[in-house]
Amino acid sequence: MVWFLMVFISLCLTTGCSNKAADVPDGLIITAAHVDESAYSNAQLLYKVDDMDTAYYWTKEGAYEYGPFRMESNKGSYSVTYNKDYVFTSDPKVGSYVTFAGYKAKVVSNSDKSFNVKLVNGEPYTGLSGSNIKYKGTTIGIVSSYIINGEIKCQKVR
């Protein structure tokens, strides 16, 4: 997993995590499950670390449903699914840990419509958005995220 994050961060640094480079399609999707490429003609396997870490390029904008996962691509805005160690729950409690944009984060506040997280150990925020909310391994909604004054704001979408 550490190697995977290093490769991903390196990729972000070299491409700027944007759609400006000619060889970078609309979105980079990282999934924790195998995607049947034959079902999605616009999915191109970028690299595969193991059975749990796979990166895909999507050559068109749009949202794609695959089992419990929702994968979105919109001009460099990415959806991500996470490993089983830290995942969003249906209602993350203040003080609990979640995985956000591939990094461990602590929930610092929670309300009916949003919750805020702070990254642990000063790890960098990679700018990913459209994160899945999972409860016991099942995706129950999407979280859209943005940054205000250095804090990551997460809006719940059920």
Regions found by a protein language model. Give the residues of each.
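Secondary-structure transition/turn motif
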Residues: 32-36, 58-62, 81-87, 118-125
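Short coil-to-beta transition motif at edge beta-strands of beta-rich domains
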Residues: 91-99
